[in-house]
Amino acid sequence: MQFFKTLAALVSCISFVLAYVAQDVHVSFPSTAGKSRVMIGKVEPRIGIDETVPTTITVEDPNEVIQVNFAIESTNKPFQNTLLIGLPNKNLEMAFEPEIKDNGKLSMYKYRIDLAKLDAALLQEASRSPEPIKATLILASSTAKPKENLFREILQLNLNFDVDHSDSSLVDKFGIKPEIHHIFHAEPKRVAKPIAVIFVLIIFITILSLIVTWLNSCAAAFNNIPTGVTAVYFLGFIATIVGFEVIFARYYLGTSIFETLFSSLYLGAPGLLTSTKFLRSFGQTI
């Protein structure tokens, strides 16, 4: 039993050694002479809910420069070194990359945060929100275990100065947008009116030209009315013309193109036969 306890303790120590730990974390203010730095201390990974209260700093100068410094063992550098500044609950955060200098067994990390260069949308929302701006440190690698990566809030900034709200559209511009719903319009149930008018004019001019031609050639006269079998072909010819006019009128009023094509096919086959026979026999009697 003692052996297993010792082994478990050894494994825990090894895991702690491999974890990313920020040593001697402190905040300095290089833009303000004489302002003392703020010590945070060692920051290490925490599993589960982190109940540690982050350090709070009140900022009264809108041009303040805040510098976050810490050290990491040179043999255990993380691939991702990011400091997030912003309001996580509002999805307004800016990512800062560090300046890294190797100093023997330790690597010195320095993040420089210039408040004057923070996004206007972030500053405007922070001035309206009761919660402070949060600084979250991320030290992680894809090859490390989740419990070895560091993702912790280390600092809170209370802004004690007036923020310019002249361009209030910035918050809405970078905020969460409502979901886009696209409405697909239904397929048109009738042909476009300009196209229908063009075809009506073409058919009207064609029929009018046909009637004028018949009158000028004396083909349309009472003494030329067909009789016998030719009269049947004549009625079929007239029915074909009237039928196609009705089909086209129904198409313009809302009948689908497929029904129109089927109707034209059903009328066109017998209409072509009777009209051809009528015109052939009628042409011989003119």
Swiss-Prot record:
Quaternary data: Component of the oligosaccharyltransferase (OST) complex, which appears to exist in two assemblies comprising OST1, OST2, OST4, OST5, STT3, SWP1, WPB1, and either OST3 or OST6. OST assembly occurs through the formation of 3 subcomplexes. Subcomplex 1 contains OST1 and OST5, subcomplex 2 contains STT3, OST3, and OST4, and subcomplex 3 contains OST2, WBP1, and SWP1. Interacts with SEC61 and SSS1.
Q: Which GO terms describe its molecular function?
A: structural molecule activity
Where does the protein principally reside? endoplasmic reticulum
Name of the featured protein: Dolichyl-diphosphooligosaccharide--protein glycosyltransferase subunit SWP1
Q: Which gene encodes it?
A: SWP1
Q: Which Pfam families match?
A: Ribophorin_II_C
Task performed by this protein: Subunit of the oligosaccharyl transferase (OST) complex that catalyzes the initial transfer of a defined glycan (Glc(3)Man(9)GlcNAc(2) in eukaryotes) from the lipid carrier dolichol-pyrophosphate to an asparagine residue within an Asn-X-Ser/Thr consensus motif in nascent polypeptide chains, the first step in protein N-glycosylation. N-glycosylation occurs cotranslationally and the complex associates with the Sec61 complex at the channel-forming translocon complex that mediates protein translocation across the endoplasmic reticulum (ER). All subunits are required for a maximal enzyme activity.
- Topological domains (Lumenal): residue ranges? 20-194, 250-252
GO term, biological process aspect, one: protein N-linked glycosylation
